[in-house]
């Protein structure tokens, strides 16, 4: 427990996604808890919607004195100390959770981005605006995504209750309960008004007491899902002063340390005729950060930034999203064709849930990878999918299947990888020698 607390002081240990229909308050709820706005890009600010995956860390504290539940729970930024003074009663606030929030876009054309975010989630907040009928289209699709990724812990946040009467809020609460019964998802419904901070302590209470800390394996081989990548150098920086590329994501298993030799798969993908050549990026970790906190080692859970010696041009503008990072020579295989056991959603609010056909083009989400695919041999329960872009993945991994309907990719089903055809990665001679020594 002491070790877990020491880790929690420095980095988040739990990933919670915010999902739901567009403009239902996902980014606002994250800001109410963390104090950080996840809307940062120019296009997002202009339109006041999330376009890329947003992220923010927050520490949740519990007052050990006179404050009673749920008001004994308070949240602050991730750089806050592990003990604070309670301004309500003068008691001591003790750290009980350190959470990374993954803020997903709600617009229908950004469904693939939302699905990428589910790859690293341990639990979700499903936002439903109280001033609109339930369900809205993306509420339904996002709930499908929760089922696909087998996320068991769901908190339904009935937001914007300040915009409706008590009777309207209760009526919509009944709509939400009926909606949840149409799926395999269940969870408590928490009314909030995030814009003015109403009932945020109750939400924190549920995060602490309803969502358990996931069991992590820090002794396994490290595997990090990449959801962001950056070039942090300002224009005009001299070559001798440039920093290497920065990779953002979440460690699923294992540990990473400053100085580790790392590999990123599938890396640089080149098409030669009818075959792919994959050259993984090989680099070294020069820094680890959890927001503004410097780390010497990173544990599974939470979002971290990894500074590398890579050419930053390969990392800029999220070029590495969908790749997988780990220690050199110890990552899953790279597949260009997969056999999937799948099922389509029997109930859907959109058209086009007909059977998949040989030769049809579909979109697959594998981990944080989004890739087009052409269907090969297929029957009602399994099929072969030729990937437009190779993916680093594992047998048994869950995938999401989307079909283009009215010029938009819409989620229609899910599956599990049962087999596949691999690509042998190509390395420079000196890297091959290093791998043999590591083996």
Swiss-Prot record:
Map out region (G4) in residue numbers: 159-162
A cellular component term from Gene Ontology for this protein is: cytosol
- State whether it acts alone or in a complex, and with which partners, per the record: Eukaryotic translation initiation factor 2 eIF2 is a heterotrimeric complex composed of an alpha, a beta and a gamma subunit. The factors eIF-1, eIF-2, eIF-3, TIF5/eIF-5 and methionyl-tRNAi form a multifactor complex (MFC) that may bind to the 40S ribosome.
| Annotated positions binding GTP | 23-28, 159-162, 193-195
Q: Which organism is it from?
A: Encephalitozoon cuniculi (strain GB-M1) (Microsporidian parasite)
Q: Where is this region: G5?
A: 193-195
Assigned keywords, A-Z:
Cytoplasm, GTP-binding, Hydrolase, Initiation factor, Nucleotide-binding, Protein biosynthesis
Q: Where is this region: G2?
A: 48-52
Q: What does this protein do?
A: As a subunit of eukaryotic initiation factor 2 eIF2, involved in the early steps of protein synthesis. In the presence of GTP, eIF-2 forms a ternary complex with initiator tRNA Met-tRNAi and then recruits the 40S ribosomal complex and initiation factors eIF-1, eIF-1A and eIF-3 to form the 43S pre-initiation complex (43S PIC), a step that determines the rate of protein translation. The 43S PIC binds to mRNA and scans downstream to the initiation codon, where it forms a 48S initiation complex by codon-anticodon base pairing.
Q: Which InterPro entries match?
A: eIF2G, eIF2g_C, eIF2g_dom_2, eIF2g_GTP-bd, P-loop_NTPase, T_Tr_GTP-bd_dom, Transl_B-barrel_sf, Transl_elong_EF1A/Init_IF2_C
Q: Where is this region: Interacts with CDC123?
A: 415-427
- The UniProt record lists the EC number as 3.6.5.3
Query: Which GO annotations describe the biological process of this protein?
Result: cytoplasmic translational initiation; formation of translation preinitiation complex
Domain tr-type G, residue spans: 11-215
Q: What catalytic activity does the UniProt entry give for this protein?
A: GTP + H2O = GDP + phosphate + H(+)
Q: Write the lineage as a comma-separated list.
A: Eukaryota, Fungi, Fungi incertae sedis, Microsporidia, Unikaryonidae
Instruction: Name the coiled-coil region(s).
Output: none
Primary enzyme class: hydrolase
Protein name as annotated = Eukaryotic translation initiation factor 2 subunit gamma
List every stretch annotated G1: 20-27
């Amino acid at each position: 427990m002491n070790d877990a607390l020491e880790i929690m002081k420095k980095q988040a240990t739990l990933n919670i996604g915010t999902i739901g229909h567009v403009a239902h308050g996902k980014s606002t709820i994250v800001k109410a808890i963390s104090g950080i706005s996840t809307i940062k890009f120019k296009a997002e600010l202009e339109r006041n919607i999330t376009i890329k995956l947003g992220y923010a860390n927050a520490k949740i504290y519990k007052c050990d004195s006179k404050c009673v539940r749920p008001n004994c729970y308070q949240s602050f930024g991730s750089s806050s100390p592990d003990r604070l003074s309670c301004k309500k009663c003068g008691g001591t606030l003790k750290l009980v959770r350190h959470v990374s929030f993954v803020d997903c876009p709600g617009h229908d054309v950004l469904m693939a981005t939302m699905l990428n975010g589910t790859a690293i989630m341990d639990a979700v907040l499903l936002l439903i605006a109280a001033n609109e009928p339930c369900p809205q289209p993306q509420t339904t699709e996002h709930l499908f995504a929760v089922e696909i990724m087998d996320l068991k812990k769901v908190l339904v946040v009935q937001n914007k209750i300040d915009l409706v009467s008590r009777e309207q809020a209760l009526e919509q609460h009944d709509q939400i309960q009926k909606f949840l019964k149409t799926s395999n998802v269940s969870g408590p419904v928490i009314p909030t008004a995030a814009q003015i901070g109403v009932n945020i302590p109750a939400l924190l209470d549920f995060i602490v007491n309803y969502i358990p800390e996931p069991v992590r394996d820090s002794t396994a081989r490290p595997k990090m899902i990449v959801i962001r990548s950056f070039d942090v150098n300002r224009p005009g920086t001299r070559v001798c002063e440039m920093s290497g590329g920065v990779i953002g994501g979440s460690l699923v298993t294992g540990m990473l340390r400053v100085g580790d030799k790392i590999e990123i798969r599938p890396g640089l993908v080149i098409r030669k005729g009818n075959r792919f050549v994959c050259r993984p990026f090989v680099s070294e970790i020069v820094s680890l950060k959890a927001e503004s906190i410097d780390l010497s080692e990173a544990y599974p859970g939470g979002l971290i930034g990894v500074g590398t010696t890579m050419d930053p041009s390969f990392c800029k503008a999220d070029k590495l999203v969908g790749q997988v990072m780990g220690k050199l020579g110890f990552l899953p295989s790279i597949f260009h064709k997969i056999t999937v056991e799948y099922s389509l959603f029997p109930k859907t609010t959109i058209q086009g849930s007909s059977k998949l056909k040989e030769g049809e083009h579909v979109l697959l989400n594998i981990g944080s990878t989004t890739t087009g695919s052409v269907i090969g041999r297929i029957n009602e329960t399994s099929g072969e999918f030729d990937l437009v872009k190779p993916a680093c993945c594992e047998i048994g991994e869950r995938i999401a299947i989307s079909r283009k309907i009215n010029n938009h990719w819409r989620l229609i089903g899910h599956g599990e990888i049962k087999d596949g055809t691999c690509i042998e990665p190509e390395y420079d001679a000196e890297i091959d020698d290093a791998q043999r020594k590591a083996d």
